[in-house]
């Protein structure tokens, strides 16, 4: 029973979000860490994400059954009823939002609610099924966790929070398009109008390169604006440049498109994990660091 209730919350997604939440939280803390606030933020947002994923599984049952990757989900196989999954999601959401309301800030709660509404109400119920722009809308909800972590400390949506929101939104696009390419047949069978299916893999490849290039520039705004230091800048330059080179390899002749997309996807996770860790530990402004070298 525990396995069913855990699997419906998509633990892999929760773990990925935990890293970005912690990164945003520690970036805003700048070394002055409130451990209880951090625990409440991490647990609260994890439960909110788990809630959204559980309800998404209920909504997506009809398309999950058409996809090889998702047809073994417990809401599809009948191991868990739709009502049980829905109630599970609602309870997790109530507890998660309760923790955020009780222990964090109004700004953090607002963005958690914003991300939840976008993911469940806009993306899952409509955009994913009906529009090629569903990925873009979904990217907004995927970018919320680090902003929640940041705002839990700062209490406001400032330039640092805005950079995180744009940065993580841009990252979501090539990450998601890569999945859609190597899972092309799944999305096609389910009738989901992701860019590779709706407008072709060649256009998706161009978008992947474009988004990574813009993302690499936006990431630099953190050190340029004084939120992170030289170490973060080095990690960002190396990992983002390598990711861009990897994306450009998609234009080689006779390339295995599916294998290439898997590589782009895998490195996207390495990139965002490395940057989340880097911004958590290198929160000193780059200007004083450069002056210290003189």
From Swiss-Prot:
Belongs to the UbiA prenyltransferase family. Protoheme IX farnesyltransferase subfamily. Carbon 2 of the heme B porphyrin ring is defined according to the Fischer nomenclature. The chain crosses the membrane at residues 8-28, 35-55, 82-102, 107-127, 132-152, 162-182, 208-228, 229-249, 263-283. Converts heme B (protoheme IX) to heme O by substitution of the vinyl group on carbon 2 of heme B porphyrin ring with a hydroxyethyl farnesyl side group. It is an enzyme of class 2 (transferase). It catalyses: heme b + (2E,6E)-farnesyl diphosphate + H2O = Fe(II)-heme o + diphosphate. The keyword Cytoplasm does not apply. Keywords: Cell inner membrane, Cell membrane, Heme biosynthesis, Membrane, Transferase, Transmembrane, Transmembrane helix. Pathway: Porphyrin-containing compound metabolism; heme O biosynthesis; heme O from protoheme: step 1/1. Its main location: membrane. GO terms for cellular component: plasma membrane. GO terms for biological process: heme O biosynthetic process. This is Protoheme IX farnesyltransferase 1. It comes from Pseudoalteromonas translucida (strain TAC 125). One of its GO terms (molecular function) is protoheme IX farnesyltransferase activity. It is a multi-pass membrane protein. Gene3D superfamilies: UbiA prenyltransferase (1.10.357.140). It is found in: Cell inner membrane. It comes from the Bacteria. The lineage of its organism: Bacteria, Pseudomonadati, Pseudomonadota, Gammaproteobacteria, Alteromonadales.
